[in-house]
C-alpha cells in the first residue's frame, strides 16, 4: 500500500499538454487533457524486491489543422518497474525506471474517417507514446517525486503503534 501511495504521488492526477505544434511546417496544434487513474502495483520478491507498476490513463486529444479539428479518445497504460532499496536507519527508497515509448500501450479512437486518416498519416499513436514517456520521465525526476520515492518505515511503524 505504501509503495502504491508513493507511485500515485509520482504519477500525479491530471495534466494538460499543448497546444504543441506538430507536423510539416508545425501547422497542426495538438492539445490533450490527460487523466491518470489509480496505479496497480504487484510486488515480486527475489534477490531484490521489485514492483511491476501499471498506470491506466485516459486522454482527450484535439488536433487543430486550421481547416478541421479531429478529436481523439485514447485509453492506455504505462508500464513501469521499480526496485526497493533499504537505507539507514529505516528508509525504503524506490528506484523507478523511466518509461520508454515501448512501455506505453494505447488504444486510440475517433469518430470520423478524416480523423483516422490524420491519425495514420500523422503517426499520432507514436507521438502520443513519445509525449507520455517524456512527461512521466520528467515527473520521476521532479522534486516532489524524489520526496515521494523515500518511504520512512520507522515513522509509519511509530504511527501504527501510536507513539
Residue ranges and their predicted role:
Residues 104-118:
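Short secondary-structure boundary motifs at beta->alpha junctions and helix caps
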Residues 1-2, 6-7, 115-163:
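Extended, low-charge, aliphatic-rich alpha-helical segments
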Residues 1-104:
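Hydrophobic-cavity lipid-handling domains and compact docking modules
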Amino acid at each position: 500500500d505504501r509503495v502504491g501511495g508513493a507511485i500515485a504521488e509520482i504519477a500525479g492526477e491530471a495534466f494538460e499538454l499543448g497546444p504543441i505544434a506538430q507536423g510539416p511546417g508545425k501547422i497542426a496544434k495538438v492539445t490533450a487533457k490527460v487523466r491518470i487513474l489509480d496505479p496497480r502495483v504487484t510486488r515480486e520478491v527475489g534477490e531484490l524486491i521489485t514492483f511491476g507498476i501499471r498506470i491506466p490513463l485516459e486522454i482527450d486529444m484535439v488536433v487543430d489543422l486550421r481547416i478541421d479539428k479531429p478529436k481523439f479518445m485514447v485509453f492506455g497504460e504505462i508500464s513501469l518497474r521499480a526496485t526497493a532499496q533499504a537505507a539507514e536507519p529505516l528508509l525504503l527508497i524506490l528506484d523507478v525506471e523511466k518509461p520508454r515509448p515501448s512501455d506505453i500501450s494505447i488504444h486510440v479512437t475517433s469518430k470520423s474517417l478524416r480523423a483516422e486518416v490524420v491519425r495514420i498519416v500523422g503517426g499520432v499513436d507514436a507521438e502520443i507514446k513519445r509525449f507520455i514517456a517524456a512527461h512521466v520521465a520528467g515527473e520521476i525526476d521532479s522534486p516532489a517525486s524524489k520526496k515521494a520515492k523515500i518511504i520512512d518505515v520507522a515513522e509509519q511503524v511509530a504511527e501504527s503503534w501510536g507513539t
